[in-house]
């Protein structure tokens, strides 16, 4: 059986038109399937988009389970990152406002407490306080 057929047998079409993979996923939620030809696990969305090796596949629907070729496009890592930022899916640390950063720099609270308050890592708080992030802002 061809790999694409194997994938199509295990999808569920949603009301938004996504073809959601119903099998195994990785820790980021992307569908995975065993390819007997190569002896490797491959990403379903890459197979369905006919992505060349080394390329980046973008999901217009932002659904990592989606295998619908109409929701997939080939792009660059930079385009994928820009898409993530524009859609608010980037690392939470990038969502801090300038006011948040200034409050972090001026706070006497612990890194642990501030990380919980702002929903970022302790390392992000540490980096802000040491000027390694948001260096354009000064106390």
From Swiss-Prot:
Superkingdom as given in the UniProt entry: Viruses
Record InterPro entries: His-Me_finger_sf, HNH_nuc, Homing_endonuclease_His-Me
Gene Ontology molecular function, alphabetical: endonuclease activity
Pfam families, per database record: HNH_3
Descriptive protein name: Protein 2.8
Organism: Escherichia phage T7 (Bacteriophage T7)
């Amino acid at each position: 059986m061809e790999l694409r057929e194997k994938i199509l047998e295990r999808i569920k079409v949603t009301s938004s038109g996504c073809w959601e993979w119903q099998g195994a996923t990785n820790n980021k939620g992307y569908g995975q399937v065993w390819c007997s030809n190569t002896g490797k696990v491959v990403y379903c969305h890459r197979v369905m988009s006919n992505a060349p090796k080394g390329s980046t596949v973008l999901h217009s629907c932002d659904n990592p389970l989606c295998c619908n070729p109409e929701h997939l496009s080939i792009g660059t890592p930079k385009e994928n990152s820009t898409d993530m930022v524009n859609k608010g899916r980037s690392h939470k640390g990038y969502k801090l406002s300038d006011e948040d950063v200034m409050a972090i720099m001026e706070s006497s609270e612990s890194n642990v407490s501030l990380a919980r308050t702002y929903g970022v890592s302790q390392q992000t708080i540490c980096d802000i306080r040491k000027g390694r992030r948001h260096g354009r802002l000064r106390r």
